[in-house]
């Protein structure tokens, strides 16, 4: 549901147009805009960090060469209430799809896999005291690790939100 809401907001924002109503006679302006002109507002990669997903239900967003990694809403719902997070130490080097930790819940335990190759630069210390953040806010406060990535082209191999939603539907059938 959260993914649908994000997509709806992005669709709405992408189509916004600003229209100014003339309050005085429309006189030519030196830069070519006139009162009543239509200007489109655009959002792009510079403004929105795109969330990418793996088939194992991890996600990653990137900003300034650092990736933030977490698990998807689908994964946290399947796990149930998370009661313990096992995360790597800062400085750990990871390869794409390498196991880097685990989440334990009241229902099951699940391994975590790195979406990219790189080095862990930070772990979410709040999860030690409150592992339930993974359930309450899997895309914001419940992130797991931050990492530099050594091969940016690996991002292209991950699924977009739309592709991930289709993937989820295909495995639920």
UniProtKB/Swiss-Prot annotation:
It is found in: Mitochondrion. Keywords: Lipoyl, Mitochondrion, Transit peptide. Binds 1 lipoyl cofactor covalently. GO terms for biological process: glycine decarboxylation via glycine cleavage system. One of its GO terms (cellular component) is mitochondrion. Its main location: mitochondrion. The modification N6-lipoyllysine is found at residue 107. Gene3D superfamilies: 2.40.50.100. The glycine cleavage system catalyzes the degradation of glycine. The H protein (GCSH) shuttles the methylamine group of glycine from the P protein (GLDC) to the T protein (GCST). Has a pivotal role in the lipoylation of enzymes involved in cellular energetics such as the mitochondrial dihydrolipoyllysine-residue acetyltransferase component of pyruvate dehydrogenase complex (DLAT), and the mitochondrial dihydrolipoyllysine-residue succinyltransferase component of 2-oxoglutarate dehydrogenase complex (DLST). Interacts with GLDC. The glycine cleavage system is composed of four proteins: P (GLDC), T (GCST), L (DLD) and H (GCSH). This is Glycine cleavage system H protein, mitochondrial.
